[in-house]
Amino acid sequence: MILSGKTISEKLTEKELEITPLTEEQIQPASVDLRLGPHFVTIDDSKEAVISFERPIRYREWTTSDETIVLPPHTFLLATTMETVKLPNHLTAFVEGRSSVGRLGLFIQNAGWVDPGFNGQITLELFNANRLPIELPIGRRICQLVFAEVTGEVAPYQGKYLFQKGATMSEIYKDAF
């Protein structure tokens, strides 16, 4: 069952669910809006001839103190949320792009699942589908988390992205076959 904004607020008040920092305006009727953080990562294409699942990829990462970042046309970028999210073992969340943002041609995430027990910042996969650059304001609401109850017993998330801070690079090379 999808949680209502009222239920989300109650779980936040009871510290059953934690999202920090958070303002009341971010809580929506059935979701929580998350804001764009200042940390970014992109594949360093000057050092990579091909992207492989079998080895680490070299990335370029930076944190900006600017108020905006410009995403060039047809460009992929990893970003992070300002907020840190801590889910209990009985809740899961879906990361969804905000409709108003998507209508500008900015695609947000293609791996939008947050497992029960996750604790960390959310890495966002951003893609500018336009022929024009998009100026992204740091601190602007960019995506939303939709929460759902998980039935039955579940082991908390213990994966490689637990406690991630900032935009986090792919670690698919660590996966077992």
Swiss-Prot record:
Catalytic activity field: dCTP + 2 H2O = dUMP + NH4(+) + diphosphate
Site-annotated residues for Important for bifunctional activity: 112-113
CDD domains noted in UniProt: trimeric_dUTPase
GO-annotated molecular function: dCTP deaminase (dUMP-forming) activity; dCTP deaminase activity; nucleotide binding
InterPro entries: dCTP_deaminase (IPR011962), dUTPase-like_sf (IPR036157), dUTPase_trimeric (IPR033704)
Broad class of enzyme this protein falls into: hydrolase
Induction: Repressed by both deoxycytidine and thymidine.
GO biological process terms on file: dUMP biosynthetic process; dUTP biosynthetic process
Enzyme Commission designation: 3.5.4.30
Regulation: Inhibited by dTTP.
Keywords: Hydrolase, Magnesium, Nucleotide metabolism, Nucleotide-binding
Pathway annotation from the record: Pyrimidine metabolism; dUMP biosynthesis; dUMP from dCTP: step 1/1
Annotated catalytic residues: 125 (proton donor/acceptor)
Binding-site list for dCTP: 98-103, 110, 115-118, 123-125, 144, 157-160, 164
Reported cofactor(s): Mg(2+)
NCBIfam families documented for this protein: dCTP_deam
Family to which the UniProt record says this protein belongs: Belongs to the dCTP deaminase family.
Reported function: Bifunctional enzyme that catalyzes both the deamination of dCTP to dUTP and the hydrolysis of dUTP to dUMP without releasing the toxic dUTP intermediate.
Self-association state and partner proteins as the record states: Homotrimer.
Name of the protein: dCTP deaminase, dUMP-forming
